[in-house]
Amino acid sequence: MDSPTLPHSISASSSTPFASAAVKPHRNKLLSRNGILIIIAASCILLLLISLLIYATVSKSSRNHHNPSHQTPTSDDHPPPETPPSPPPIAQIRLACNATRFPDHCVASLSKPGQVPPDPKPVQIIHSAISVSYENLKSGQSKIQSILDSSAGNRNRTNIATICLEILSYSQHRTESTDIAVTSGDIKDARAWMSAALAYQFDCWSGLKTVNDTKQVVDTITFFEGLVNLTGNALSMMLSFDSFGDDVVSWIRPATERDGFWEKAGPSLGSGTGTEASLGFPSGLTEDVTVCKNGGKDCKYKTVQEAVDSAPDTNRTVKFVIRIREGVYEETVRVPFEKKNVVFIGDGMGKTVITGSLNVGQPGMTTFESATVGVLGDGFMARDLTIENTAGADAHQAVAFRSDSDFSVLENCEFLGNQDTLYAHSLRQFYKQCRIQGNVDFIFGNSAAVFQDCDILIASKHSKLEQGGANNAITAHGRIDASQSTGFVFLNCSINGTEEYMKEFQANPEGHKNFLGRPWKEFSRTVFVNCNLESLISPDGWMPWNGDFALKTLYYGEYKNTGPGSVRSSRVPWSSEIPEKHVDVYSVANFIQADEWASTTA
């Protein structure tokens, strides 16, 4: 508002009745009194105008104080129009997206105005890629819910949609944690969690393909293909950022060890630092509750699940220790996502036994749900017990132990089964001095897992379908993207057969072929380092999955193994000898960062 001006009739430059010296007051007393009245009236008017001016100024200031958006009005007192979003920084986006498997898809997803800030730092581009993945994940969850809502009466589709919703909730949580970890600079954690988020999305996509009998499902499958690519793009950027830092020009597309790409390594496997020996199950733990099969005055629970249910749901860092006394516990145990740092301590292998027999031969059963013990809560640990699935080999997939627990340690534990005994599904897991027994793909999943000083035993199938011999693969790793920080590492392990199986093998060695692994997914990764491989391992060492699938993209490595099954002269050409200068990549500290979370000191 413009400032008011004084009226010309009473301005300082105007003539007044009292301005002339020729006017004499004594000539007319009435006129003098009138002049005085005029002066008084003029003064009142002047004071009134000044008051109005002050009020207007203060009022305007007050409005500006309480309404910041009006602090800089235009000349006509209207607010300025909103500034449109800056155009996307295409050059920087293109550079970052060149480090992904799907660069064009990546650029398109990040080119919406305002999606990436002007002149962005590499971390800001990564954040934007995570955000795009997250928003599409939320849309995917809505699509799955719609499938579930429309699938009443269809058992298989209902089961798949239900499992999808469950694992996508884990994907959502891991994606949220990834974004926080990138901000705080914990890039190894970020990569581990985004690797899991991607695995869950892929698993849902794979499950949907088994029930693609409606247009709604087919369209959702197509949507999830795009989501998997978006998440993989974000993960690819994280890998390059971890390897090359802010120098985006140096970023490269995800590559494998066979391409000559090796991650940076810290302490070596044989450095004498004692790092490997000092990692494992913590000492000095005191039980919070005790489980006894037949009860007792010192035992609060009779089942393991009751004890798990009693653990607090808070995001605690203190371990909740469950002591499980000797006995055979016939039950299905689930450690849910909200139960963190749960610990099982038994009375020894073969003494404390948790047993079940769920398998995919049962109507509506899936591999994921068949586990005798399934763990989702982070920080899970176990020691001195046996977990088994007694379903026979002809029942096909029948999991004894399934883990999606990050920062997980299992020491001096036994896992018994046939096909798919140990499902190391996702995240970072450490198995030390364990005994793992099975026959077909009996260590499988898409986790980053290290097996140290373990006995790996091939068991007899007792199969009516495979009389006279069969092929067995120990591992089936499921890495789906080269940017995932996952794989199986076997350090100082013994690879042999059970006593019963070795009798069968020696009676008919040509009829029994045993392999270190086969590629379940395209970028399968498994290595054996300083292991003893007995004669039951076939000279070619590794087994194809189906034709030439994944043979150009997998990484199967060996280093300084011993025993009659370790000779590499007849190995398949798509396996590798690990260069000595790079073997430290697979240490417990480097591969799963166990030096940060698996100290033997409680």
From Swiss-Prot:
Pathway: Glycan metabolism; pectin degradation; 2-dehydro-3-deoxy-D-gluconate from pectin: step 1/5. Glycans are attached at residues 98, 156, 212, 229, 315, 492, 496. The gene is PME64. One of its GO terms (biological process) is defense response by callose deposition. Residues 87-237 are annotated as: Pectinesterase inhibitor 64. This is Probable pectinesterase/pectinesterase inhibitor 64. It is an enzyme of class 3 (hydrolase). Residues 81-90 have a biased composition (Pro residues). It comes from Arabidopsis thaliana (Mouse-ear cress). Substrate binds at residues 367, 397, 518, 520.
